[in-house]
């Protein structure tokens, strides 16, 4: 969508094929020509913080976004169409939020000279993205006028609970916030939100710096609203998890469909067992499922479970993942669904599955039979 630099070849915007998600390497800079000469710049601050936290800093300049780029690329039209689609559904809170955003789109002054620098930070589950964000807010939030935007309410718990500088994206659209009150916007779990939504919000608030954190393995990145389609540079990345151990990392890597390999923490002792559907669930474990159909099926036997999309951003000591051939075959073919299910446990757990899905895990064969209907760039999650 929003092109950071001109390229020859087949890159297209929101209405065509997705642009490359590769970092922009042609504008590489060394530490000498930026962070050392601009130590107080927010991107220098973020570089220092993330490098200390174990991230690889890619040494690329942030991308730039303005109203002209958003309009010319088709991003605004795609976002408007998404919102109008939500209004046509039978819903309550989602429709109210969509109506507010549509109203904002109509009223915002797109002729203004607003421009923002944008960078993407990628990290595997458990690398400490939320902890790094919290550290940035604690140490530099006041000086750089930071605000943290979260796509769904579960993230308001845990390390972000009770913070006065942290809001849901929907809430910031609805609140009366003075233009220019915030200078830097941090976004967690960016793969769960339409990227144009973030950029419109930044323009609406007069934000000058947008830094988005996320795990590409947990987002449906082929959707038009995904951050990868905007070709913003990946400024930092880390794939060494502190949360889970080698067993979980091996399981993820054997079924990730060619994504970036993750590294487990050797100090964490985790394990996984695979069983048929019959039999008991692990004691004291949290039950996770891939579809609402399986969730309803289990509830008939008084087994409560958590849908994978509701577990996004959450962690549990031990999990039991239940996968029914009848309901879950298409969903488990989605690498994003697998990534969420397999990375919620700190100590591993058990996967109980039907014979067809068991064969998929054994053979590493997850050829897609369908598309997940989870939160994507083309639809918003009703529990936001």
Curated annotation (Swiss-Prot):
One record GO biological process: transport of virus in host, cell to cell
Domain (+)RNA virus helicase C-terminal: 239-384
Keywords: ATP-binding, Coiled coil, Host cell junction, Nucleotide-binding, Transport, Viral movement protein
Subcellular localization: Host cell junction, Host plasmodesma
GO molecular function terms attached to this record: ATP binding
(+)RNA virus helicase ATP-binding domain: residues covered: 88-238
Major localization class: host cell
CC annotations in GO: host cell plasmodesma
Residues annotated as binding ATP: 123-130
UniProt-annotated stretches for the region Disordered: 1-36
The protein's assembly and partners: Homooligomer. Interacts with movement protein TGB3.
Family (UniProt): Belongs to the virgaviridae/benyvirus TGB1 movement protein family.
Function: Transports viral genome to neighboring plant cells directly through plasmodesmata, without any budding. The movement protein allows efficient cell to cell propagation, by bypassing the host cell wall barrier. Engages in homologous interactions leading to the formation of a ribonucleoprotein complex containing viral genomic and messenger RNAs (vRNPs). TGBp2 and TGBp3 are necessary for intracellular delivery of TGBp1-containing vRNPs to plasmodesmata.
Name the record gives this protein: Movement protein TGB1
Organism this protein belongs to: Beet necrotic yellow vein virus (isolate Japan/S)
